[in-house]
């Protein structure tokens, strides 16, 4: 189940961050406007991917995904745009990922 969660979060990040990046490229960087259309489709795919998580709590999934989004955005910027995160970016991303682990892996049940 953990592997499935990680894979779905990674796919969601690629769809959301990639979609937003495509729109950014069309609007801010002068790429063809059809890039924005592809971005909108990728953002729509992100919405569907989130529903595939095993946990039924929308709030929990989206809150945990937020941490993945933070780290994934920095990674995307580094790989795709040549952005160089500083130590505070990295520390912030690690804090977010620790939060993701707490939210998703905490033992839950009666009295939790």
Curated annotation (Swiss-Prot):
It is found in: Cell membrane. The chain crosses the membrane at residues 6-26, 32-52, 61-81, 87-107. This is UPF0060 membrane protein CMS0846. Keywords: Cell membrane, Membrane, Transmembrane, Transmembrane helix. InterPro entries: UPF0060. GO terms for cellular component: plasma membrane. It is a multi-pass membrane protein.
